């Protein structure tokens, strides 16, 4: 019977038994806790409690019978402040609080003793305390100390001004101080002498006491000479306005550059002042030199001439503004000169061709005129015959440096404008010296030369 048993079958049975035992065993990983135990790492999604999951039978959402009402815990009386806003009153203050109170009372008792000692040595009555309780330090307090150098006491408070004088005198003193700061020492002395007058006398006599400089400037637009008030005649008009006698006039006199851009205009009822103020170098009259109308300076200041139209052989406007040319050759005189007739003045009749005022608004020193330069006169009589008015003659002078200078020559009234010979014979202003070396230059060469000079000046002005 024993021989019939196969050892291989016995081995197979052992392997089967071992595999069945392995399958019955739990997995090798972490074991899950039994349902009765709680795991704080788990959280239920239904009730939000820790210790179980949503599938557990301990969840109160699934088993309502097992849900318990949370019981309130007992009160802890020692940690809660039932009356937080009630101040604590200490019936018996400690020894530390007593020491603090004594230290605060000691300086209060020493203050009246110090004031009494200071009153005895200085002899001054005791000071009354201010309503805000802050004491004020006076400069005399520093003088009471006998030893040591006297310190410098500076206060940042402004001096009080009397309310009666605060309205008028304070503003006048501030204005007077600002004016004195911008004037020279000589003007300060004259202004201090005029300040002793009354307010009304100061307004009328400021122009007479303070030496006002003449308003004759050497800028691009020379102004008429304005005389002080005391030099004008009694019957004539007053050229200086009333505002010039006040402090505003002094500030304008201190800034002469701001007045160059505003030409002064004389009124009509002042003919002697207007004739006296016009000098040889003025640029205000646009009419002929020997035939200046009576209202020429007023028209020159108020109504400036319009931009003339350019002909085929005339000078462009850019060359006129460059400073080397005078005016176009076909400029017509104002209509007042032809209608009112000639009115010759003694100063204007004595002028030479070099002194005749030009139309360009430039000072006379900016254009050098050499006596050795050759001169040439040109005029277009065809345009004058069509217009029916008197043309203006332009005298061109070629300088040594290759530039040109021009000046206006007034032509007298002639009956036959078609004849150029009669025009040259009747003009009294052309001197023999200028006609003798006269060389006729074609207009094209003259126009090209003027364009070159104007372009060179424009480039120089751009570089500056």
From Swiss-Prot:
Residue spans of biased composition, Low complexity class: 180-197
Family: Belongs to the FAM90 family.
The organism of origin for this protein: Homo sapiens
Disordered, as annotated region: 1-42, 70-389, 411-437
Note: Primate-specific FAM90A gene family, thought to have arisen during multiple duplication and rearrangement events.
Name of encoding gene: FAM90A3
Comp. bias regions, Basic and acidic residues: 74-89, 97-114
Protein name (Swiss-Prot/TrEMBL): Protein FAM90A3
Top-level taxon of the source organism: Eukaryota
């Amino acid at each position: 019977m024993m021989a019939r048993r196969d050892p291989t079958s016995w081995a197979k049975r052992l392997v089967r038994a071992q595999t069945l035992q392995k399958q019955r065993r739990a997995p090798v990983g972490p074991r899950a806790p039994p349902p009765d135990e709680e795991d704080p790492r788990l959280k239920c999604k239904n009730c939000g409690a820790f210790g179980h999951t949503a599938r557990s039978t301990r969840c109160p959402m699934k088993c309502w019978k097992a849900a318990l009402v949370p019981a309130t815990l007992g009160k802890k009386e020692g940690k809660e402040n039932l009356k937080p806003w009630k101040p604590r009153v200490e019936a018996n203050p400690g020894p530390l609080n007593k020491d603090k109170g004594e230290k605060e009372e000691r300086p209060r008792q020493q203050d009246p003793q110090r004031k009494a000692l200071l009153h005895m040595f200085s002899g001054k009555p005791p000071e009354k305390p201010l309503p805000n309780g802050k004491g004020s330090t006076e400069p005399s307090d520093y003088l009471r100390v006998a030893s040591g150098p006297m310190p410098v006491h500076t206060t940042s408070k402004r001096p009080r001004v009397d309310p009666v004088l605060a309205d008028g005198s304070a503003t006048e003193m501030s204005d007077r101080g600002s004016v004195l700061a911008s004037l020279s020492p000589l003007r300060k002395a004259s202004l201090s002498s005029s300040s002793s007058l009354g307010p009304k006398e100061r307004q009328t006599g400021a122009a007479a006491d303070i030496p006002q400089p003449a308003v004759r400037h050497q800028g691009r637009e020379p102004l008429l000479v304005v005389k002080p008030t005391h030099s004008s005649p009694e019957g004539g008009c007053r050229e200086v306005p009333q505002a010039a006698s006040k402090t505003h006039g002094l500030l304008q006199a201190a800034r002469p550059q701001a007045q160059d851009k505003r030409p002064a205009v004389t009124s009509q009822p002042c003919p002697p002042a207007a004739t006296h103020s016009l000098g040889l170098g003025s640029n205000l009259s646009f009419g002929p030199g020997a035939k200046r109308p009576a209202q020429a300076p007023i028209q020159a200041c108020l109504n400036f001439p319009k931009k003339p139209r350019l002909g085929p052989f005339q000078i462009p406007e850019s060359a006129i503004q460059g400073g080397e040319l005078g005016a176009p050759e076909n400029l017509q005189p104002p209509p007042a000169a032809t209608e009112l007739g000639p009115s010759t003045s003694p100063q204007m009749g004595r002028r030479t061709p070099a002194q005749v005022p030009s139309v360009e608004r430039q000072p006379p020193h900016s254009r050098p005129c050499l006596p050795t330069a050759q001169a040439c006169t040109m005029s277009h009589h065809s345009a004058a015959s069509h217009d029916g008015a008197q043309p203006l003659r332009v005298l061109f002078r070629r300088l040594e440096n290759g530039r040109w200078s021009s000046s206006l020559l007034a032509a007298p009234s002639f009956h036959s404008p078609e004849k150029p010979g009669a025009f040259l014979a009747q003009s009294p202003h052309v001197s023999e010296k200028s006609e003798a070396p006269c060389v006729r230059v074609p207009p094209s060469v003259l126009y090209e030369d003027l364009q070159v000079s104007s372009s060179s000046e424009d480039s120089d002005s751009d570089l500056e």
